[in-house]
Amino acid sequence: MGCGMSRLAKATIALVILVMLFLPAAMAAASFDATRSQHLPLPRGTVRGPESVAFDGQGQGPYSGVSDGRVLKWNGDKLGWTTYTHGPGYDSKMCTATKFRPETATESQCGRPLGLRFDQKTGDLYIADAYKGLMRVGPGGGEATVLVNSVDGIPLSFTNGVDVDQTTGQVYFTDSSMNYNRAQHEMVTRTGDSTGRLMRYDPRTSDVTVLQSDMTYPNGVAVSTDRTHLVVASTGPCKLLRHWIKGPNTGRSEPFADLPGYPDNVRPSNKGGYWVALHREKNELPFGRDSHLLAVRVGSNGKILEEMRGPKSVRPTEIMERNNGKIYMGSVELPYVSVVKRK
């Protein structure tokens, strides 16, 4: 009996060791490499930074805002990119960057489109312009109209993320800081600035409601699939927040996910959950292996389900997944939109 117990104990210990060895791998998030990608190059010159990626109701696009203040539309390899919209009073000559006049010197006048989102029913494109505020342009493009540039008498300093409830047409958007603009974005993180706001615009009444104030670097925003809450990226703290817009918790915000990097835009995934673009990892080192996290897919429970990796030279600001399996990647630095195909 003593010998039998010894064998049982040994078998139990061996089983525990095997579980400890293999369970972490089984529980780890799936990962895929996005190093090899197709590029949709922006017009040659000094234009760069296709920060957000959007498609209209007919599946045309992508559309993306760039560093000279315009929103461009991709028309295929033959035609490439063409101007779709820009802010009021846009002067193409003055807004064209040169070696002696970088876009940072002109963007406060020319605008800097960040988040983009179509209302699929109306065809309207909503634009979160860092300097001009929340704008809208109708189907076909042209000059955009500024809808909101201040709320409760306080100017929008750093309009950033936007999403549209495709059922009601309500528009949700963020102002990342009352104290700093986009050109000073590093100060928002460095100082721990907590003056950001999450807002709602009603296109039927033009009313604007502040849903939450005193936020730390609110960035991208996404309406949940069931339309009960918003998922908001908090860049400096490397977190996602959940803000309830329906049900008994309406008006309440709570932590949703801790992230391994600094999040930018948040977009729904066709496989469930949300793709969160990571501008860079926490405590990322410039040397070593040329690979880092580009994005993570977070499930409805806040757990990381999937990781996307790629070279450190790529720092995405948005991940947009299409039904055909293609993933479009925006960047505030690169002169192209990346397209990755799932294997």
How does the language model describe each region?
Residues 25-49, 94-105, 303-305:
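A short helix->beta-strand "capping" segment at the edge of beta-propeller domains
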Residues 38-71, 314-316:
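Beta-strand-rich domains and repeat architectures in extracellular enzymes and scaffolds
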Residues 40-46, 85-88, 105-109, 147-154, ...:
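Surface loop/turn motifs at the tips and blade-to-blade linkers of beta-strand repeat domains
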Residues 56-59, 118-122, 164-168, 225-227, ...:
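Residue-level detector of Asp-centered blade-edge/turn motifs that repeat once per structural unit
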Residues 75-79, 138-142, 201-206, 244-249, ...:
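Short loop/turn segments that connect beta-strands within beta-propeller blades
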Residues 98-114, 120, 124, 128-189, ...:
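Asp-box/WD-like beta-propeller blade repeats and closely related beta-sheet repeat scaffolds
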Residues 258-309:
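Loop/turn-rich, solvent-exposed surfaces of beta-rich toroidal or solenoidal domains
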